[in-house]
From Swiss-Prot:
The gene is AGE1. SUPFAM superfamilies: ArfGap/RecO-like zinc finger. GO terms for cellular component: cytoplasm; endosome; trans-Golgi network. Keywords: Cytoplasm, GTPase activation, Metal-binding, Protein transport, Transport, Zinc, Zinc-finger. Residues 134-143 have a biased composition (Low complexity). This is ADP-ribosylation factor GTPase-activating protein effector protein 1. One of its GO terms (biological process) is intra-Golgi vesicle-mediated transport.
Length: 482
């Protein structure tokens, strides 16, 4: 088995000539040694995170302590990445695309200046771990620090709202607001009134006015749900809502280049036209995103790296910076790779978190919310656990059947880009005898309305005068009979 490490340039390189390290990794006690090192790193990170959150930068001395803690966290994260890289072979199959020294890791920026004092103090760094794959969300995006919740809170805040009542939905709203202080205000206009709407694919919370504009964009751009009215039955979606909704993270991506435009951010008092134009430029055209024109290869590399590190923030950034939609990326990736290579969808299924003995496929769920293609169930299932296959089958039944039905519907909108997975859905339906009754459509059925039902002759048209005359004639006829 090959092992991997990082070189001086922080790139992934094979660990075949590292002497003592390679021999240690090949010994039987390697798993216990690695797990103990990870546990120690997690303990140190947890302690530093507590110090980081409680420390206040009210004076120069406090800011110096703040910088020391931040640098220590960065060093520990770098050490933890080295430990994670030793576990790449179990999670990254042989022949997976882009497994090369170009798959480099970005590190948390420790270059803080006085001008960044206020902006960074409002963020907090938390780290998420699980037994299968350790995660690290250390990304250097315009000197903004992504926000994640504490791993200890993730296990205590994971609820099932299958039969959610009003009190439970209010509790969910309270949890989402406590994740990040930025969630107390609307992500787009900063309003504090009725901030109860969430975009489940963008992972931001909105006011009722901005949520209406998001709905008009289409579900392929923003999927809007109500935190107080809708029921969330998916464990994976609940995990994302309870741990990854952050307005500051979304604005760090979609407003990263806003200062270079003469456009001002909208406020709660902005009119409807200003609000609509700003939100369309922000999310549909990605006008304020830095480097939002990445090609397929660069986008796929960023996406694979984000999945490997279990970083939702990095996946958000990879999707935002690509000039292609996630559906287009995965479709092209599926065409380029042969059947012996794992797809991005299959690779994401190997990254999950165990909560109370149940695997939570939150990485795959986030990708599904953003339109990733779903593969057919494999013919050989020996390499997949029953829980993975169960989740896979459920999502294929949900999204695959839905796409098969939607293939008969006309596309609307000049910017709508929906490529349906017809072959995968139809083959899956035949295998599992999922019968979907789709009415046959005529040649003119693609039109919303037709002129065929309107009579060509004007004589057949009834005017109000003709109706009145007919009404009188009927009365006269009745009198004649009497």
């Amino acid at each position: 088995m090959d092992f991997y490490t990082t070189d001086i340039n922080k790139n992934v390189v094979p660990l075949f000539s590292k002497g003592t390290v390679a021999r240690t990794a090949s010994k039987a006690q390697y798993p216990s040694w690695c797990n103990n090192a990870l546990k120690l790193t997690n303990i140190l990170l947890k302690s530093l995170r507590c110090k980081f959150q409680t420390n206040r930068c009210e004076d120069d001395r406090g800011f110096e302590v703040y910088c020391v803690i931040l640098k220590s966290i960065a060093l520990l994260m770098a050490a933890k990445e080295s430990l994670i890289l030793l576990q790449i072979p179990p999670s990254l199959p042989s022949g997976f695309p882009f497994r090369s020294p170009q798959l480099s890791f970005t590190y948390l920026s420790t270059r803080l200046s006085g001008s960044q004092h206020k902006s960074t103090h409002s963020h907090h760094i938390n780290h998420q771990t699980h037994p299968i794959h350790s995660s690290s969300s250390n990304s250097n995006s315009n000197n903004r620090i992504p926000t994640k919740t504490d791993s200890s809170k993730q296990h205590t805040q994971h609820f099932s709202f299958a039969n959610a009542g009003a009190s439970n939905r209010d509790e969910l709203l309270s949890i989402v607001r406590k994740i990040d202080k930025s969630n107390l205000k609307c992500c787009d206009c900063g309003s504090t009134a009725t901030v109860e709407w969430v975009s489940i694919n963008l992972l931001c919370i909105l006011c009722i006015k901005c949520s209406g504009v998001h709905r008009s964009l289409g579900s392929h751009i923003s999927k809007i749900r109500s935190l107080t009215l809708d029921n969330f039955t998916s464990l994976e979606l609940m995990h994302l809502l309870q741990n990854n909704v952050s307005n500051s993270n979304v604005n760090a991506i979609y407003e990263s280049n806003l200062r270079n435009f003469p456009v001002k951010k909208i406020t709660a008092n902005s009119d409807d036209s200003e609000r609509s134009k700003f939100i369309i430029d922000k999310y549909q055209f990605k006008k304020f995103v830095i480097d939002s024109n990445q090609g397929r290869e660069a986008s796929l590399k960023s996406l694979i790296k984000a999945i490997h590190l279990d970083s939702v923030f990095m996946m958000q950034r990879a999707i935002a910076q690509s000039k292609y939609s996630l559906r287009e990326l995965t479709a092209s990736e599926k065409e380029q790779n042969d059947l012996n290579h794992s797809s991005i969808f299959q690779y994401s299924l190997k990254h999950y978190e165990i909560v109370d003995g149940t695997p939570i496929f939150f990485i795959t769920e986030f990708l599904l919310c953003n339109g990733i293609h779903i593969d057919n169930l494999p013919k050989i299932t020996t390499n997949w656990s029953p829980k993975v296959l169960e989740y896979w089958e459920t999502k294929l039944e949900m999204y695959g059947t839905f796409q098969a039905v939607n293939t008969s519907r006309p596309r609307s909108g000049p910017h709508l880009n929906m490529h349906s997975n017809v072959d995968s859905a139809s083959s899956y339906n035949k295998k599992h005898d999922l019968r979907v009754n789709i009415p046959e459509r005529s040649a003119s059925a693609s039109k919303r309305w037709s002129l065929s039902s309107i009579p060509k002759s004007s004589q057949n048209l009834m005017s109000p005068t003709n109706l009145l005359t007919m009404h009188k004639s009927l009365k006269l006829a009745k009198k004649d009979k009497k």
